[in-house]
Amino acid sequence: MSKPIQMEKGVKYRDADKMALIPVKNMPTEQKEVLRKPEWMKIKLPASSKRIDDIKSAMRKNNLHSVCEEASCPNLAECFNHGTATFMILGAICTRRCPFCDVAHGRPVAPEAEEPKKLAKTIQDMKLKYVVITSVDRDDLRDGGAQHFADCNREIRALNPEIRIETLVPDFRGRMDRALEAMIDNPPDVFNHNLETAPRLYRKVRPGANYQWSLDLLKKFKDQHPNVPTKSGLMMGLGETKEEIVEVLKDLRAHGVTMLTLGQYLAPSRHHLPVERYVPPAEFDELKEIALELGFTHAACGPFVRSSYHADLQAKGEEVK
């Protein structure tokens, strides 16, 4: 029997090392037949550009992280060329170990006190008008990192008064009330928390998370800030059924959520959860129609849609696929 990995603080555990720490054992992609990508999933990635290099340089200069890079998002080049980025605060090491995600797991170091000011200045230098702020899970912090989110919102607005801020938050497991209280005076313009998948698949896909808890987080925030839109996203292709997704959409609407993203799951490596199915574009279109019929005001649904993909256009209600 192999010895458990002794995690060192500040060390990133990825791929096989990360998967070995998950209490629920999943069959990695390397042990299953890898599905061939259909034609609609084959895109030509844009070449590097000065805009991409400038954004990466600004991140490195200020010791900031983007979820675009840390999670190996397939839309990185497109978004960076568009002049948008999703900043990941509170470090690049997550206390969770979800087998679909490429963000590193481990014991994170203490939050950087100057990060909110650095983030605000970087956004000012980049002349952004809409920004998405997300974070790793920080179960080691008493408020899950909520005060750090609030501090970032405050500092960003101080230097960028015309900006719109979307926050994509973790579930603040076990500390929801404390987290919501920390953010009450500095809420975002859009509050986003992803359910990710159907409740039947939570044990496999989101070990340590709870479906109802996530719904309650969205509802409680909406109750506190009725004028701030709430948003959530789901991945397709993890073994869910269409009927299960429709039920999740109904649950989201029952908890006040009006903005939705649906996209195709792609395995970051052979060590992650395998893709069970590639969902055809027509099915995404059908789910979008269902979402709008259920009362969602915004629904971005398509194979390459991600939670923060063209978030500025989503917030304006423009078509995003």
Curated annotation (Swiss-Prot):
Ranges where the Radical SAM core domain occurs: 80-297
Annotated keywords: 4Fe-4S, Cytoplasm, Iron, Iron-sulfur, Metal-binding, S-adenosyl-L-methionine, Transferase
Reactions catalysed, as given in the entry: [[Fe-S] cluster scaffold protein carrying a second [4Fe-4S](2+) cluster] + N(6)-octanoyl-L-lysyl-[protein] + 2 oxidized [2Fe-2S]-[ferredoxin] + 2 S-adenosyl-L-methionine + 4 H(+) = [[Fe-S] cluster scaffold protein] + N(6)-[(R)-dihydrolipoyl]-L-lysyl-[protein] + 4 Fe(3+) + 2 hydrogen sulfide + 2 5'-deoxyadenosine + 2 L-methionine + 2 reduced [2Fe-2S]-[ferredoxin]
An annotated Gene Ontology molecular function: 4 iron, 4 sulfur cluster binding
InterPro entries, alphabetized: Aldolase_TIM, Elp3/MiaA/NifB-like_rSAM, LIAS_N, Lipoyl_synth, rSAM
Species for this entry: Aliivibrio fischeri (strain MJ11) (Vibrio fischeri)
Protein residues bound to [4Fe-4S] cluster 2: 94, 98, 101
Family of this protein: Belongs to the radical SAM superfamily. Lipoyl synthase family.
Subcellular locations according to the entry: Cytoplasm
Co-factor binding comment: Binds 2 [4Fe-4S] clusters per subunit. One cluster is coordinated with 3 cysteines and an exchangeable S-adenosyl-L-methionine.
Protein name, as recorded: Lipoyl synthase
EC numbers, comma separated: 2.8.1.8
Keyword Iron belongs to the record: yes
Record: residues binding [4Fe-4S] cluster 1: 68, 73, 79, 308
Domain of life: Bacteria
The protein's required cofactors: [4Fe-4S] cluster
One Gene Ontology cellular component: cytoplasm
